[in-house]
Curated annotation (Swiss-Prot):
Domain of life: Bacteria
Encoding gene (name): moaC
Subunit structure: Homohexamer; trimer of dimers.
Function (record text): Catalyzes the conversion of (8S)-3',8-cyclo-7,8-dihydroguanosine 5'-triphosphate to cyclic pyranopterin monophosphate (cPMP).
Enzyme class: lyase
Protein residues bound to substrate: L75, C76, H77, M113, E114
Organism taxonomic ancestry: Bacteria, Pseudomonadati, Pseudomonadota, Alphaproteobacteria, Rhodobacterales
Origin species: Cereibacter sphaeroides (strain ATCC 17029 / ATH 2.4.9) (Rhodobacter sphaeroides)
Any GO BP annotation: Mo-molybdopterin cofactor biosynthetic process
Catalysed reaction equations from the record: (8S)-3',8-cyclo-7,8-dihydroguanosine 5'-triphosphate = cyclic pyranopterin phosphate + diphosphate
The protein, known as: Cyclic pyranopterin monophosphate synthase
Molecular function GO terms recorded: cyclic pyranopterin monophosphate synthase activity
InterPro entries found in the cross-reference section: MoaC (IPR023045), MoaC_bact/euk (IPR047594), MoaC_sf (IPR036522), MoCo_biosynth_MoaA/MoaC (IPR050105), Mopterin_CF_biosynth-C_dom (IPR002820)
UniProt key word Ion transport: no
C-alpha cells in the first residue's frame, strides 16, 4: 500500500496536485443496502409510501450526490462526470433494497468517492422516505466494488 497522499511533508491536509497526470477513462462501481422489514419493503415496491416513489427519488438523490461529492468531501477534486447510473433492486432475502452506482469520467483522478457518495445518498434517501413506518432500518455494506483507469490500474473487490 502506498503512503497517504492527502498530507504534505508537515502533516497538513492538502488537495493532491493532479495537474501532471494524464487524462484517462475512469470508472467506479459501489454498492450498499438498506435492510428493512418485509412489510416496509412491500410498501416501497408497491408504491404505497406516503412520500411517493421511494426508488425513483432515491435514484435521483444518488445522481445528485455523485455530482456534489466535491462539495461534501473536503479534499475531493470537482470532476467532469460523464455518467452516473444507479440500480436499486428490491431483495426479499435481505429484506431490503440493494443500491449500486456506476460513475464514469475522462479525467486526471478517479471517481471512487463519487460512486460511494451516490450509494450513500441514495440509501439515506430511502431511509428518509420510509422512516415514519420503520426507524430501525439498517444502512449496510457500503463499499467500492470496482475501480478502473489511471496509474493504479484496476481494483476489483473480493466477494
Amino acid at each position: 500500500m502506498s503512503g497517504l497522499t492527502h498530507f504534505d511533508e508537515s502533516g497538513s491536509a492538502h488537495m493532491v496536485d493532479v495537474s501532471e497526470k494524464p487524462v484517462t477513462a475512469r470508472v467506479a462501481v459501489a454498492r450498499g443496502a438498506v435492510k428493512m422489514s418485509a412489510e416496509t419493503l412491500a410498501l416501497v415496491t408497491e408504491g404505497r409510501a406516503e412520500k411517493g416513489d421511494v426508488l425513483g427519488v432515491a435514484r435521483l438523490a444518488g445522481i445528485m450526490g455523485a455530482k456534489r461529492t466535491a462539495d461534501l468531501i473536503p479534499l475531493c477534486h470537482p470532476l467532469p462526470i460523464t455518467k452516473v447510473a444507479l440500480e436499486l433492486t428490491a431483495d426479499p432475502a435481505l429484506p431490503g433494497v440493494v443500491v449500486e452506482a456506476t460513475v464514469k469520467t475522462g479525467g486526471q483522478t478517479g471517481v471512487e468517492m463519487e460512486a460511494l457518495t451516490a450509494v450513500s445518498v441514495a440509501c439515506l434517501t430511502i431511509y428518509d422516505m420510509v422512516k415514519a413506518v420503520e426507524k430501525g432500518m439498517e444502512i449496510t455494506g457500503i463499499r467500492l466494488l470496482l475501480k478502473e483507469g489511471g496509474k493504479s490500474g484496476r481494483f476489483e473487490a473480493s466477494a
